[in-house]
Amino acid sequence: MLEPSDYELTHKWHTDYDIQKMTCGQFRFVSKEIEKNWATAKSTNNLREIYLAICAIDNDRMIGYISINEIDHIHRSCHCGGVVVGDKEYRNTREYVEAVSLVHDYVFNHLNMNRISGGCLVEHIMSRAEMEGFFYDLEGIEKEAIFKDGRYHDKRNYALMSKTYFAHKSNGDYEVGKTILRIAKNVKQLKYNK
């Protein structure tokens, strides 16, 4: 889980425009005190949302975080609020794929969710490639849903159902190497079709 002491790193990432420009959230300047309160709140409430640190395989250093939000135990659904890999050295690497895979395992095998949703800006090719690489289905596009950088952006909405997850899991489709290759192929195709 994210720890209150992680606020120094999350503050650095939350105030880095290059990291935040492709997220669906608004870019905001925040003080370290506000960030400290945010990290404390995220690390002490795990009923409706869970924030997990992503750590490097080689040295166990925190390189980012991933969140599970809108956890609904009645409807058995939740939302992947996003993945932030703040350390540029580790972007689009094995750590990212393993973090998402662990979240899927936790969501479907431990929280007993039936679906996990996710969304991204239409122009965020990497997020699209990743969600499709993990077999999320496109459920629709919200027109001009996100206001960012002085203009409105369309948002793609995806979902991964438990039956889809377990079918691909039993086929071995979520092996890290296969997933990385699928994502790379998707990126290439999306850039070509752009």
Each PLM stretch: what is its role?
Residues 18-39:
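Conserved GNAT-fold acetyl-CoA-binding loop/helix
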Residues 21-23, 51, 168-169:
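Short, hydrophobic secondary-structure boundary micro-motifs
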Residues 1-7, 58-194:
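Acyl-donor (CoA/ACP) binding surface of acyl/acetyltransferases
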